[in-house]
Amino acid sequence: DKLEEIFDRPDGGLEISKGISTSVPDLGALRKSRPDQSPSEIGPNVIELCQMADITFMALHGSIGENGKLQATFDNLGIKYTGPNSLGCTLSMNKLVTKQIFKTSGVPTPRGTSLTVKTKDTRLDELGYYLPLVVKPCSNGSSIGVYICHTEEDYYDAIHKSFDIDNTDEVVIEPFIKGREFACGIPLVEIVPKDGLFDYANKYQAGGASEICPPVSLDAETQELIQRAGERAFEALRMDVYSRADFIVSDADGEFYCLEMNALPGMTAASLLPKAAKAAGYE
């Protein structure tokens, strides 16, 4: 009955979770009504309620719902739930581990390295990487804390800002690839941001991006290759139900790369996975 204490430091993905439905209770009012004024997003009696249900629908984003803790708790208690199991969530939440698994499984992915709190002052010229670069928290969701760095000043500023994000003790650094983005669910959805990166704002603001399914700018053969790579990625990360792999096709050479895996992709009417499912014939 103290499950809520395990999840007392939610990250930025929480804002998206609150936006899943307009019919959810007022969480601010709910917290104020608690005798202990607990700020937890998971309150008392959650376990009892979930045990009463035939199945629990997972609609949590960011580490609070995708790092595998909640799934492991439910597994131990015999509670059925939607989405991947605890192992799949744990593996995919860590972007560096995901890269390593992709490489051993034949899934094309950008090379990358990481810095921890102890090594965050490492100079750019010591990394063996060249600008432009992408800097992002090793374990976070919704593209929160993702920075594209074109100058050394950008790089050091991004490192500083990334480590300022709650619960961030490691950041991933990888080459920036300019290209077209595709979400693989398995049918592909092409993502065309209105302005620059498909970041937090463009993902969740109306009109932030155009989403085309099936893609019209990609030939059938390349679509098939990306879908097969997506299947290998799902299998390698133990994504045994539904999930979404994000790919980019390089403008420079036409090669495609898997950027990361989303264990619990958005499931609103405007989200990418439901659009892909509809294109595949699922309503």
PLM segments and residue spans:
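ATP-binding N-terminal substructure of ATP-dependent carboxylate-amine bond-forming enzymes
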Residues: 1-87, 91-93, 97, 104, ...
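Active-site nucleotide/adenylate-binding loops and adjacent lid/helix of ATP-dependent enzymes
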Residues: 43-50, 89-172, 178-179
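Glycine-rich phosphate/pyrophosphate-binding beta-alpha loops
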Residues: 62, 143, 194, 262-276
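Residue-level detector of anion-binding/catalytic polar loops
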Residues: 80, 108, 283
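Short beta-strands and strand-loop turn motifs
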Residues: 80-85, 111, 137, 258
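Conserved metal-phosphate-binding beta-hairpin within the catalytic cores
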Residues: 175, 184-186, 234-267, 277
